[in-house]
Amino acid sequence: GDTGKVKPFGQKDNGGDLVETAFLIQGLLAVHQYYVNGNEKEKALAQRIDQIWRDVDWNWYRQGGQNVLYWHWSPTYGWEMNFPVHGYNECMIMYILAAASPTHGVPAAVYHDGWAQNGAIVSPHKVEGIELHLRYQGTEAGPLFWAQYSFLGLDPVGLKDEYCPSYFHEMRNLTLVNRAYCIRNPKHYKGFGPDCWGLTASYSVDGYAAHSPNEQEDKGVISPTAALSSIVYTPEYSMQVMRHLYSMRDKVFGPFGFYDAFSETDNWYPQRYLAIDQGPIAVMIENYRSGLLWKLFMSHPDVQQGLRK
């Protein structure tokens, strides 16, 4: 909106949302780096972004100094949502930025104790015969936005820590699990296969759902953003899906690209877009093509300091 007021996502979710704030800041820091050495108007924009970045109080979301970050805080309900964020899921970028903040930064222990759960985030296992190294919250292998949202700016290539020897390899394998599950197609949905895979959070046949590669959370809905935003991990397989979807363009393609989701089984082709799904397609295609957004975000000195921390 144009008022700056919060639009409640739910009754008690009517205040600060640190995860979504982190996604916003990730993008803004890339924009900052693009304009910081430009003309006077561009430099002024970069300065405004820098002020927003410095104003985010990451430390507040430790709820009294705990070594974990909480997702929500409400001016009317306080901490009643009570959602401490542990890994692994889409929220890694929140912990990276919280460590990187020059004004309201958190100590490294918040990452190690909260996100990594003192090492419990490490849980080597196989899904669809493919090796995964991390523990995925509530599931053996999560939806594909878990491999994408934190890495729109944060470059997974060469990124590692004591819990994961290669975040790029881990996210690639998470993507391959999703593809392999869709090819196996245990619920026998129409259309699923090597050229039509990709389960993630999107519009769904019954509203909105975080579709995942398991029989409980697979509703037969393909979300184009899932495979297309995976192009940095699986370029050939993602292009295979893109070509197939384009051959179905009368049903799944519109003025702003591929629609958010569809189900051949249910003959469900809603001509709707969802910005948080559309955005990663463009960003990840450009990262695959040139690495532009990765280079911009990773060049920010605060980000580098946070990663070293």
Which residues fall in each region the model found?
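Ser/Thr/Asn(+Pro)-rich, low-complexity disordered segments
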Residues: G1-K309
